[in-house]
């Protein structure tokens, strides 16, 4: 359970942006970097599905997919000359205004532990 909780924490935008931001990168490169990092984290944690209920695993996968969609959506609203900092700001704005809440996902997973 610890690894899946860490995965969820690590893919929340307010967690991965400070960890990965290279302000001067073009936003397109940063977009790819973020998506690749999330996919690598997910692949590393694939075996965790053995320890979770089908519902908890599905919620985790959906959260990952929705975060990637959010990143792509934020990127489409960036002007061509935007930087990684611009994209990071847009991602956080989208995340704050969205229904995606990592804490809700964590509650579902933690409920299984108890």
Identify what each model region corresponds to.
Residues 1-114:
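Conserved non-transmembrane functional hotspots
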């Amino acid at each position: 359970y610890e690894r899946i909780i860490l995965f969820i924490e690590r893919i929340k935008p307010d967690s991965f942006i400070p960890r990965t931001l290279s302000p001067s990168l073009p936003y397109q490169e940063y977009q790819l970097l973020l998506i690749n990092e999330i996919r690598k984290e997910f692949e590393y944690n694939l075996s965790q599905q053995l320890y979770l209920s089908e519902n908890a695993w599905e919620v985790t996968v959906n959260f990952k997919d929705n975060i990637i969609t959010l990143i792509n959506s934020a990127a489409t609203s960036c002007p061509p000359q935007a930087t990684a900092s611009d994209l990071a700001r847009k991602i956080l704005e989208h995340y704050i205004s969205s229904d995606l809440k990592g804490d809700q996902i964590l509650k579902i997973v933690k409920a299984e532990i108890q």
